[in-house]
Amino acid sequence: MKAHKETSAGVVMSSPMATPELDEAIEVDVATSENLPWMCIVWDDPVNLMSYVSYVFQTVLGYDKKRANELMMQVHTEGKAAVSSGERDKVEADVKKLQVAGLWATMQQAG
């Protein structure tokens, strides 16, 4: 129920009669850009051999041969693959290492 108050201009304003009180705070977990992981993306290029890309994934990122080949095939067939993810500093370091090895690597935030 609302109380009505008439102003000097004849306008009726309403306001709540009682304000409900919250006994406990409600916490909402909102996904913000600060807590989303970063991803290292390797892009297909016309320069590097498939065997070399697989080799780089093994030596630079530490993947076994099977996983390195799966990621290399994803790059080859889909044009790109997310090859690592995590905190920004770690992914940034992975991107730099892959670029030094001659691969086309970028980073982006998940989401």
Swiss-Prot record:
Q: Which residues cross the membrane?
A: none
- GO biological process, alphabetically ordered: protein catabolic process; proteolysis
Q: Which InterPro entries match?
A: ClpS (IPR022935), ClpS_core (IPR003769), Ribosomal_bL12_C/ClpS-like (IPR014719)
Q: Which family does it belong to?
A: Belongs to the ClpS family.
- Quote the subunit structure annotation: Binds to the N-terminal domain of the chaperone ClpA.
Q: What does this protein do?
A: Involved in the modulation of the specificity of the ClpAP-mediated ATP-dependent protein degradation.
Name of the molecule in the record: ATP-dependent Clp protease adapter protein ClpS
Organism of provenance: Corynebacterium aurimucosum (strain ATCC 700975 / DSM 44827 / CIP 107346 / CN-1) (Corynebacterium nigricans)
